[in-house]
Design a protein with these regions (language model features):
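Alpha/beta-hydrolase-fold enzymes
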Residues: 43-134
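Catalytic active-site module of serine/aspartate enzymes centered on a nucleophile-bearing elbow/loop
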Residues: 210-237
Length: 237
């Protein structure tokens, strides 16, 4: 199960823990969020000013992506269909216990919700879109783990529920701490990083990694701009 409140609180709880360590300077604690955690870390930093520096890499605004769809393609009709779907899933969980399902609901050619109980099939169809293939190659391939939800299971079917009610990044314009936003030139969610960057106030920096896709910046050591992250944190802490 994912929840915007829990994920945001995780960052503040991590600051709590670090701040209790004798070897940690409480005035030099920073945070970074990758993919969906990018929107959560900005949300956390807007209120928790103990986070002195914040960075994101290939950030995803999970609440926007769930509610509006990738590239804002979800229709009002689809949102109503999804509410009906979530209501059915909730009753099913009441009667039977937890039910696995997608954290972002897709629709078929007849505008019907597509339900599945596993994030990825064992084998992708030949006509799979490039973004799905990139995620598949990562989660089912080189980053596979038997206990990973994305590798070998599914999220709770009710995951979108809380994200619909409680959008992320509501106050990121108030973040005064230094901010670094990194994304890939070819990342399918690049626009989310750019939209967040445009809302942020100085000091801020946007880095677009040439030829990098979203998933490239998960683990491709030759594309992740480690030097930039290192420079940013050293200069601002």
């Amino acid at each position: 199960m994912a929840s915007p409140d829990i994920f945001v609180e995780d960052y503040s709880a991590a600051v709590d823990f670090l701040g209790k360590q004798k070897f940690v300077d409480r005035e030099r604690i920073s945070a970074i969020g990758i993919c969906g955690l990018g929107s959560h870390v900005l949300t956390a930093a807007a209120i928790d000013v103990r986070i002195k520096v914040v960075a994101t890499s290939v950030m995803y605004d999970m609440s926007d992506s769930m509610w509006k769809g990738l590239n804002n393609t979800k229709t009002e009709e689809q949102r109503e269909l999804e509410k009906d779907y979530l209501a059915k899933m909730r009753w099913q969980e009441v009667d039977e216990g937890p039910v696995g399902g997608p954290h972002e609901l897709a629709f078929d050619e007849n505008n019907k919700p597509i339900y599945w109980s596993k994030m990825f099939p064992d084998k992708l169809p030949a006509d799979a879109d490039p973004v799905t293939k990139q995620f598949f190659d990562y989660y089912v391939g080189r980053a596979f783990h038997p206990r990973s939800v994305n590798s070998n299971g599914a999220w709770d079917a009710l995951t979108p529920w809380s994200y619909y009610n409680f959008p992320l990044q509501q106050r990121i314009e108030t973040i005064k701490q230094p901010k670094l936003i990194v994304t890939g030139e070819k990342a399918h969610a690049r626009y989310m990083a750019e939209e967040a960057y445009n809302r942020l106030k100085d000091p801020k920096e946007l880095v677009i990694v040439p030829n990098a896709t979203h998933v490239d910046l998960y683990d491709q050591m030759d594309k992740i701009p480690f030097d930039k992250f290192d420079e940013f944190f050293k200069e601002n802490l």
